[in-house]
UniProtKB/Swiss-Prot annotation:
GO cellular component, one term: plasma membrane
Gene: CALS2
Name of the molecule in the record: Callose synthase 2
Subcellular compartments: Cell membrane
Topology with respect to the bilayer: Multi-pass membrane protein
Keyword Cell membrane on entry: yes
Function summary: Involved in callose synthesis at the forming cell plate during cytokinesis. During plant growth and development, callose is found as a transitory component of the cell plate in dividing cells, is a major component of pollen mother cell walls and pollen tubes, and is found as a structural component of plasmodesmatal canals.
Sorted UniProt keywords: Cell membrane, Cell shape, Cell wall biogenesis/degradation, Glycosyltransferase, Membrane, Transferase, Transmembrane, Transmembrane helix
Organism expressing this protein natively: Arabidopsis thaliana
PANTHER family per UniProt: CALLOSE SYNTHASE 2-RELATED, LYST-INTERACTING PROTEIN LIP5 DOPAMINE RESPONSIVE PROTEIN DRG-1
Keyword Signal: no
Gene3D superfamilies: Vacuolar protein sorting-associated protein vta1
Membrane side Cytoplasmic: residue ranges: 1-481, 527-552, 620-655, 735-1511, 1582-1591, 1677-1682, 1777-1787, 1849-1851, 1916-1950
GO molecular function: 1,3-beta-D-glucan synthase activity
GO biological process, one term: regulation of cell shape
């Protein structure tokens, strides 16, 4: 079935390794798709062979034989990869087939071919041609292609046999050839002459655009050009500029759809405007060329867009300009990442276009202007794109896969920014090969000289505008204003707290104020630091810098230096009697003059003048926007000083209202933060500090280097350091608090969570139809426009029942039912639930009331009956009770009305009809007079009800034999009514109907004269329509459902979706336009090699616990499994397995519950279904609307053939508005290697015919063609769709399902040069259409009900949202659907949920810093395709490629909004290792962002408050996380210093030192961050908002019980480690996290490898610090808060060491522990080497683990060594604590002696190591004796020391604590200096030492886990904690089953 091993196959390694070799060939040759890439031309022949095989095997054989011959011609030497195997397999098959087919042959091969060709032409092609309407053009296109191949084979066979081809056949072939030129596969628009009858080509807007494009009047065609039919402007551009044919076809369709969609919005009634509207052209042109015109203006060049003076030619010229841009863009490949490079190319080509059209003469040649790169085939690709592409590829190669420093190669941004300078025009046109853009590095030049290559250019240009240098200083440099603010605030607060009263009001005292003013000296120093940093970090871009930028750097540095001198000088003179530093300065400059504070203040005012100006501009953003865009020299000079002139980052400022909102947010936050810091941290710390500084300490426990130092500065630093770190970090906590409150309020105002439960939905259901129609149905013109805004949203009320009832009810019913039936298709609800939820499809004109879904009316009739029966004649009371429950009233009214209609329909007889009419009219009279209960006896109603139910049941079965029974039932009913209910009124009534003939007969009447009541009945009902069936079924439900439907639907996901959708209809959203007038859009999904569809083998494959994915899913989704069995009509799983045809359904069911491509495609194709239904509701006439969409769907097969039918029009509109492209990068490789995934992708294309797949096709050029040897590879960007299913000629059964290529555009080389995914998106973006582009990941999902809101969402692109510009990215809300899998998945989904809701809500409004975070956002497609695409692709720096799209959009004056009335599903990682990998990837990405130019520019170009928002919501979060961990380190190392030096003992009598409140406050803040407080706050607020605060509280408690704090503390370590390592050393890489279900146990060795450096090493270091502190720290045992602080750090240690085992499924199961230990031992002792993967050997893993140091540069290595020195502190401090040396003076020789001991031990270890290598083989006994002797000596010394009291057991423990860290520190330094150590020959010893440490760490971690595994209840507890209960139960069952199976099999063997 499936060839994949398990659910998660390994991704293909490299490109094509041995994929197409013998392993998967042989019989697989039947598959025409498994063809080596160099033989791709023979695939169509093999396809035809498969197609004709059923009808004529001999012809199929001849086709295959011809294919073999052609393959031999293409590659005679079989040099291509896999060609020899392919030919051999094909030949083997031909030998077999020749014998079998010869037997059945009646004529010669030539005759056989000829007769078959004639038969095919007449029977098949002519039949299709003669078919009415030629509607099935797809089959016709396919037939022409097949006929062309058959003729090719026929010709070859005839040549072989020397037979002439008959004239008749030649004639037929000529016709076929003509037609196959016209009938080519198309994407959306068939543009051939025969396509006029296609529905989409009938639209006036399409016709208008096509005819405008075909206006080629006056275009100068080259001489000798052959005219083609229907030639258009793009053909002319192709001829003149040499674009590729498929590129032209692709962009032709693109341009037509774009213009047609914009045109129709200008003219809602298309008939009004037969010509293409100029306004539409102007709109598209403005969007397309906005960036180009801005570029021209920036560089001071005139744009090349010259329009003619003759009005008639303007439209043609505009179309040519647009066509040219799109053709350049469509073929630009990787150049699309360089938008200004495209502007440069376009600038010159548009100028040439203008020259040709204006008939200009070239001054150089004297001839008419011609394009510089002529019009031959592929000229544009070869001569324009390829040279630039090669430069990109060369630079990418220099990056060495991201290992090189960023400063050593130019990334996409550098290459693009070359075109931001006027110098780019030096490149020339035609481009000069020796231009500096193309030039090489010094090394390359040297190589070229040595090889005597021609010179191509001088030195390498270097980086442009910015250098990404790996340094922490980027954090300060990018956000210098924020750091300056914090440093100056800290200084001011310390000064205020230190001086005077220490109160804030003290600032107004003269001296204090003057001291506070010293902050300006600090400000000047910080300015100088920034200026120096700017120069240092930009040094490597100096070659590309313009002179005025260099000048600015120098001026800035000089000015800052002057201020640094001037400020302290004037400050010193402002004091009468200065002290300290001020006094020194004053003495230097002769300080006898009088003081002058006012002079210092004047200097400050001058210093602040630029800031005052910027503050003024900050208050008036519109002035700032104008100035930044201005070209006036004076303005440019002024702006030049404040910030360098740059093409992007200008005019980003928001409106005054937005500015006010985010400024208020930050003002409140900063006041709170600074007040807390002052009162809780700084002020209380001043007094203890003063006290400590006064105390003199003379006794030290160690050798003190500065015994006479004053003020105890070491103690002061140890005290203040953690507090200051927390001061810089705690803004993140305040941000979490304030953003949670603001986000909660914002959400409440947006009406989130108004409908949270089913009960709330029921109570609001009556206003739902009106809300539906208000939001999802376009407004008619006559209606008043809706009010907008928050207040309007709150005051908006919906009528209980709509006024124009019929149509609105019908529309509501169609959409509501579509949603409910999608629930059923997804198996969220059962058949019964679906019946209860559906609203009648067919409108019943006879019922004058709205019919609610039965789940609202269920059990209402039986209850109403009881109430009526017990009412005792009190009418009013019953009415009152009915009026309280409106649904009951509806149910009663509907039942009565339906009963009336039904009886009137059934009874045909005249007299019975009169009686019935009379009864009904009497009842109606009673109802009107409200005397029903008083006058009638309703106690008999139950009898009537019973008879009515029986009648309905007979009607449902509708059998002829039941007619007599129905008569009896009707008579019974008549009797109940006349005798029991209307007893009093019967005689008069019957008399009136019998005209007084109501007499008693005494005589027997003959039979034929007897009157039989109800003899004439309309039964059985022969014209049983769907509407009739539905009506009867509904009536039966209303009457018989006795239990309440309160829990319908019972599935939690269905409830969540229904309530969210209903709630969203009451939120504010734009009005829905008609489908015809909506904005068109595409969805783009990048896919690499993840699961497409689970295979049966993958589903049933069991893990070690006997749990398969299928079993797991059945337990997780039990109700959905039951619903699935019901849907496929199976009673049990066994029955399902027995039916082979349901295997596919089972695979689909499982795949829809995983993170698979199938799930994503189904979700996104809901957009199309929604659009089709909405198009129907827009276009249907009243009669069709009342019949319903279902009726239309039932006739869809026939209707789609006719271009005029409503169904065809709906389909065509959906095509025009929506495209879905999946970019399957590896599809061709997978297809050629017979990979199951390729088949599954093809199956998706067949299921969804409008789905398109784009892929990169890699074709090997064969030796014969190649001019550079056999390895030449050609790359194409291709788009395919499913071909019509090929049917056998003699039967209608389909033979094969294939794809067909629509476009195939050649690329200049391999597309993947950077991060991979961005380039995968980029190559396929040319196949997308429309004005919006939604980027969707392959682990996302969509829902039918959400798809209905898409047209509303797209309208947001036309609204300014209170800002100054319309949105360029629409952010969408996500729902994380993987939360039910395990407790970890639940934490992760809650965390992610809060980010994608409340987090992004606050980012978008009020903060205005939402960017693009992964994928459900909708991009303004035209905006982004002209500005570099939807992500950035440079290797490593753009690791988080998505967020850079948001940065880019914002910097280019875009606007990102967030909308919460629509949601998309999203899968997340579910196991600890997967989650940690994801977190590591994000932390790595943030590390790279810190170095990036985008963040630097945002930090400098935003105003102060928006810059703060940007920092704290991007890298600030990660830096604060790192500071949190750093605080713990600094605190503990500070304590270590105090304890070991003896200072703590000396200060222990200081009360203030003991109860240190500020330290407690600081570390409490740190603990908040540590345990996930930052995550929990917004999470709780969002859950409270959407599900109620009591649920939030329950969830919070449950999360704590499931150890959420452990999880968040653990993730803290992950973020810190990977963010820090990326900043220090680089090594960031994409980490594939997998999308599987984690139901497996991770081995101990795997956990060790993954967490060793990030958690375990750090955890052990902290543990040693804590242990030392516990042993020697005395002072604070009693203080409660202090214990809490210590507990929180111990909690961190334990979490970092043991969380991976705690969250590991079956982590405490004894058998697993034993297996893990064996596996770990094997791994740790395995030798490494070349080709040994890290998973197999510790040595390989260790080498890889320290690999990052190789590329980290000198700075990184020095930093690593400096950080390693901290481990030597332990030894220095602890040696002096040994009991032997306590009495001695604290001499340095003691420390020296300890080093002697360490070196002695190391020498012995080294000696033993050498001995092992030299002697262990030949002198094994001798070596053993030596080893024994060494051991005994060591043991003897130890015993002697203990006996002589020279050492105590405590000393031994201390020695271990001292020497372990020292060894580790030496190891770290040795690793950093690896090249040096290797040269010295000590590397093997270092490796041995490292292995020893790893073994020790492994033991330390393994022992407690193994100990706990002894107790079975620990494992039980863990399973309960880790998985929800259903699965825990399942796990046990599965183990038992596994056991039983084993028992059975063993018995069978016996």
């Amino acid at each position: 079935m499936a060839q994949r091993k398990g659910p998660d196959p390994p991704p293909p390694q490299r490109r094509i390794l041995r994929t197409q070799t013998a392993g998967n060939l042989g019989e697989a040759m039947l598959d025409s798709e498994v063809v080596p890439s160099s033989l791709v031309e023979i695939a169509p022949i093999l396809r035809v062979a498969n197609e004709v095989e059923a009808s004529n095997p001999r012809v199929a054989y001849l086709c295959r034989f011809y294919a073999f011959e052609k393959a031999h011609r293409l590659d005679p030497t079989s040099s291509g990869r896999g060609v020899r195997q392919f030919k051999t397999a094909l030949l083997q098959r031909l030998e077999r087939e020749n014998e079998t087919t010869l037997a059945g042959r009646q004529k010669s091969d030539a005759r056989e071919m000829q007769s078959f060709y004639q038969h095919y032409y007449k029977k098949y092609i002519q039949a299709l041609q003669n078919a009415a309407d030629k509607a099935d053009r797809a089959q016709l296109t396919k037939a022409y292609q097949t006929a062309a191949v058959l003729f090719e084979v026929l010709k070859a066979v005839n040549q072989t046999e020397d037979v002439e081809v008959a004239d008749e056949i030649l004639e037929a072939h000529t016709k076929v050839e003509e037609k196959s030129q016209i009938y080519v596969p198309y994407n959306i628009l068939p543009l051939d002459p025969d396509s006029q009858n296609q529905a989409i080509m009938r639209f006036p807007e399409i016709q208008a655009t096509v005819s405008a494009l075909r206006n080629t009047r006056g275009l100068p065609w080259p001489a000798g050009h052959k005219k083609k039919l229907d030639e258009d402007m793009l053909d002319w551009l192709q001829t003149m500029f040499g674009f590729q044919k498929d590129n032209v076809s692709n962009q032709r369709e693109h341009l037509i759809l774009l213009l047609a969609n914009v045109h129709i919005r200008q003219f809602p009634r298309p008939e009004q405007q037969p010509r293409l509207d100029d306004r539409a052209l102007t709109i598209v042109m403005k969007k397309l060329f906005k960036n180009y015109k801005k570029w021209c203006k920036y560089l001071g060049r005139k744009s090349s867009l010259w329009l003619p003076t003759i009005q008639q030619e303007v439209q043609q010229r505009k179309l040519l300009y647009m066509g040219l841009y799109l053709l350049i863009w469509g073929e630009a490949a990787n150049l699309r990442f360089l938008p200004e490079c495209l502007c440069y190319i376009y600038h010159h080509m548009a100028f040439e276009l203008y020259g040709m059209l204006a008939g200009s003469v070239s001054p150089m040649t004297g001839e008419h202007v011609k394009p510089a790169y002529g019009g031959e085939d592929e000229a544009f690709l070869q001569k324009v794109v390829t040279p630039i592409y090669k430069t990109i590829a060369k630079e990418a190669k220099r990056s060495r896969g991201g290992k090189s420093k960023h400063s050593e190669w130019r990334n996409y941004d550098d290459l693009n920014e070359y075109f931001w300078s006027i110098r780019c025009f030096r490149l020339g046109w035609p481009m000069r090969a020796d231009a500096d853009f193309f030039c090489q590095t010094a090394e390359e030049l040297r190589l070229d000289r040595s090889e005597n290559k021609p010179k191509t250019g001088d030195r390498w240009m270097g980086k442009v505008n910015f250098v990404e240098i790996r340094s922490f200083w980027h954090i300060f440099r990018s956000f210098d204003r924020m750091w300056s603010f914090y440093i100056l605030s800290l200084q001011a607060m310390i000064i205020i707290a230190w001086n005077g009263s220490g109160k804030l009001s003290g600032i107004f005292q003269g001296d204090v104020f003057l001291k506070v003013l010293s902050i300006f000296i600090t400000a000047a120093i910080l300015k100088l630091a920034q200026a120096v940093l700017d120069i240092a970090l930009s040094w490597k871009s100096r070659h590309s810098m313009s002179f005025h930028v260099k000048l600015r750097f120098i001026f800035k540095a000089v000015a800052a230096a002057i201020w640094v001198v001037l400020m302290p000088l004037t400050y010193a003179y402002s004091w009468k009697t200065p002290s300290g530093f001020a006094e020194t300065i004053k003495n230097w400059f002769g300080g006898h003059q009088n003081s002058s504070p006012s002079f210092f203040i004047i200097v400050i005012l001058i210093y602040l003048s630029p800031n005052m100006l910027s503050t003024l501009l900050f208050a008036f953003p519109f002035i700032r926007r104008y100035l930044e865009r201005s070209d006036y020299k004076i303005v440019m000079l002024m702006m030049w000083w404040s910030q360098p002139r740059l093409y992007i980052g200008r005019g980003m400022h928001e409106s005054a209202l937005s500015l006010f909102k985010y400024t208020m947010f930050w003002v409140v936050l900063l006041i709170s933060k600074l007040a807390f810091s002052f009162y809780a941290e700084i002020k209380p710390l001043v007094k203890p500090t003063k006290d400590i500084m006064r105390v003199h300490i003379s006794v030290y426990r160690w050798h003190e280097f500065f015994p006479h130092a004053k003020s105890n500065m070491g103690v002061v630093i140890a005290l203040w350091s953690p507090v200051i770190l927390v001061y810089f970090m705690d803004t993140q906590i305040w941000y979490a608090i304030v953003s949670t409150l603001v986000g909660g309020l914002n959400g409440a105002f947006r009406r989130l969570g108004e409908i949270r439960t089913l009960g709330m939905l029921r109570s609001r259901f009556q206003s739902l139809p009106e809300a539906f129609n208000a939001c999802l149905v376009p407004n008619e013109k006559s209606e008043t426009p809706k009010k907008k805004g928050i207040m309007a949203t709150f005051t908006r009320k919906f009528d209980q029942v709509p006024s124009s009832k019929d149509k609105e009810a019908a529309r509501f019913a169609q959409m509501w039912n579509k949603i409910i039936s999608s629930f059923r298709e997804e198996d969220l609800i059962s058949d019964r639930e679906m019946e209860l939820l559906l609203v009648p499809y067919w409108a019943d004109r006879d019922l004058d009331l709205i019919r609610w879904p039965p789940f609202l009316l269920a059990s209402k009739i039986p209850i109403a009956l009881d109430m009526a029966k017990d009412s005792n004649g009190k009418d009013r009371e019953l009415t009152k009770r009915l009026s309280v429950d409106s649904y009951m009233t509806c149910a009663v009214r509907e039942c009565y009305a339906s009963f009336k209609n039904l009886i009137n329909f059934l009874v045909v007889g005249e007299r019975e009809g009169q009686v019935i009419n009379e009864i009904f009219s009497r009842i109606d009279e009673h109802i009107e007079k409200e005397t029903l209960i008083k006058d009638l006896n309703l106690s008999a109603l139950p009898d009537l009800y019973g008879q009515f139910v029986r009648l309905i049941e007979y009607l449902m079965e509708n059998r002829e034999e039941d007619k007599d029974q129905i008569v009896i039932v009707l008579l019974n009913m008549l009797e109940v009514v006349t005798r029991d209910i209307m007893d009093e009124e019967v005689p008069s009534m019957l008399e009136s109907t019998h005209n007084g003939t109501y007499v008693k007969y005494d005589v027997m009447t003959p039979l034929h004269q007897q009157r039989k009541y109800f003899s004439q009945l309309r039964f059985p009902v022969y014209s049983q329509t769907e509407a009739w069936k539905e009506k009867i079924k509904r009536l039966h439900l209303l009457l018989t459902v006795k239990e309440s439907a309160m829990d319908v639907p019972s599935n939690l996901e269905a409830r969540r979706r229904l309530t969210f959708f209903s709630n969203s209809l009451f939120m504010e959203m734009p009005d829905a336009p008609k489908i015809r007038n909506m904005l068109s859009f595409s969805v783009l999904t990048p896919y690499y090699s993840e699961d497409v569809l689970f295979s049966i083998f993958g589903l049933e494959k069991q893990n070690e616990d006997g749990v398969s994915i299928l079993f797991y899913l059945q337990k997780i989704f039990p109700d959905e499994w039951t619903n699935f069995l019901e849907r496929v009509k199976c009673g049990s799983e066994e029955e399902l397995r027995a039916r082979e045809e349901l295997e596919e359904e089972l695979r689909l069911w499982a795949s829809y519950r995983g993170q698979t491509l199938t799930k994503t495609v189904r979700g996104m194709m809901y957009y199309r279904k929604a659009l089709e239904l909405q198009a129907f509701l827009d276009m249907a006439k009243d009669e069709e609307l009342m019949k319903g969409y279902k009726a239309l769907e039932l006739t869809s097969e026939d209707a789609s053939k006719s271009g005029t039918s409503l169904w065809a029009q709906c389909q065509a509109l959906a095509d025009m508005k929506f495209t879905f492209v999946v970019s399957c990068q590896q599809y061709s490789v997978q297809k050629r290697s017979g990979d199951q995934r390729a088949k599954d992708i093809l199956r998706l294309m067949t299921t969804y015919p409008s789905l398109r797949v784009a892929y990169i096709d890699e074709v090997e050029q064969t030796h014969k063609e190649s001019y550079k040897g056999a390895d030449e590879k050609i790359y194409y960007s291709a788009l395919v769709k499913a071909a019509p299913q090929t049917k056998s000629m003699d039967s209608s059964e389909s033979v094969q399902t294939l794809d067909q290529v629509i476009y195939r555009i050649k690329l200049p080389g391999p597309a993947i040069l950077g991060e991979g995914k961005p380039e995968n998106q980029n190559h396929s973006i040319i196949f997308t259409r429309g004005e919006g582009l939604q980027t969707i990941d392959m682990n996302q999902d969509n829902y039918m009900e959400e798809a209905f809101k898409m047209r509303n969402l797209l309208q947001e692109f036309l609204v300014k949202h209170g800002g100054v510009r319309t949105p360029t990215i629409l952010g969408l809300r996500e729902h994380i659907f993987t939360g039910s899998v395990s407790s970890l998945a639940w934490f992760m989904s809650n965390q992610e949920n809060s980010f994608v809701t409340i987090g992004q809500r606050v980012l978008a409004s009020p903060l205005k810093v939402r960017f693009h975070y992964g994928h459900p956002d909708v991009f303004d497609r035209l905006f982004h395709l002209t500005r570099g695409g939807v992500c950035k692709a440079s290797k490593v720096i753009n690791l988080s490629e998505d967020i850079f799209a948001g940065f880019n959009s914002t910097l280019r004056e875009g606007n990102v909004t967030h909308h919460e009335y629509i949601q998309v599903g999203k899968g997340r990682d579910v196991g600890l290792n997967q989650i940690s990998m994801f977190e590591a990837k994000i932390a790595n990405g943030n590390g790279e962002q810190t170095l990036s130019r985008d963040l630097y520019r945002l930090g400098h170009r935003f105003d102060f408050f928006r810059m703060l928002s940007c920092y704290f919501t991007t890298i600030g979060f990660y830096f604060s996380t790192m500071l949190t961990v750093l605080t713990v380190y600094v605190f503990l190392y500070g304590r270590l210093y105090l304890v070991l030096s003896g200072l703590e003992e000396g200060l222990s009598n200081q009360k203030a030192f003991r109860s240190n409140m500020p330290l407690q406050a600081a570390l409490a803040s740190q603990s908040f961050v540590q345990i996930g407080f930052l995550m929990a706050l917004p999470m709780m607020m969002e859950i409270g908002l959407e599900r109620g605060f009591h649920n939030a509280l329950i969830d919070f408690v449950l999360m704590q019980l499931q150890l959420a704090s452990v999880f968040f503390t653990f993730q803290l370590g992950t973020k810190t480690h990977y963010y820090g390592r990326t900043l220090f050393h680089g090594g960031a890489e994409y980490r594939g996290t997998g999308r599987g279900f984690v139901v497996f146990h991770a081995k101990f060795a795997e956990n060790y490898r993954f967490y060793s450096r990030s958690h375990f090493v750090k955890g052990i270091e902290l543990m040693i610090l804590l242990l030392v502190y516990q042993i020697f720290g005395h002072a604070y045992r009693g203080v409660v808060t202090y214990i809490l602080i210590t507990v929180s750090i111990w909690f961190m240690v334990v979490t970092w060491l043991f969380a991976p085992f705690l969250f590991n499924p079956s982590g405490f199961e004894w058998q697993k522990i034993v297996d893990d230990w064996t596996d770990w031992n094997k791994w740790i002792y395995n030798r490494g080497g070349i080709g040994v993967p890290p998973e197999k050997s510790w040595e390989s893993w260790w080498e890889k683990e320290i690999g990052h140091l190789r590329h980290s540069g000198k700075r990184g290595i020095i930093l690593e060594i400096v950080l390693a020195l901290r481990f030597f502190i332990f030894q220095y401090g602890l040696v002096y604590q040994l009991s032997t040396f306590k009495q001695e003076n604290q001499s340095l020789w003691i420390y020296g002696a300890s080093w002697f001991v360490i070196l002695f031990i190391l020498l012995i270890v080294k000696g033993l190591g050498v001995g092992r290598q030299r002697f262990s083989t030949n002198f094994q006994l001798l070596f053993r004796i030596i080893k024994g002797f060494v051991f005994l000596t060591f043991l003897g010394l130890l015993i002697t020391f203990l006996a002589l009291r020279f050492l105590t057991p405590k000393d031994i423990f201390l020695c271990m604590l001292a020497f372990m860290p020292t060894g580790w520190g030496m190891l770290l330094i040795a690793q950093a200096c690896k090249p040096l150590i290797q040269r010295l020959g000590f590397w093997s010893s270092v490796r041995t030492l490292a292995r020893g440490y790893e073994i020790l760490m492994g033991l330390l971690l393994f022992t407690p886990v193994a100990f706990l595994a002894w107790f079975p209840f620990v494992s039980e507890f863990q399973t309960r904690m880790l998985f929800n209960q259903a699965f825990s139960r399942g796990l046990q069952i599965s183990r038992i089953l596994g056991g039983q199976r084993k028992d059975r099999s063993s018995k069978n063997k016996e």
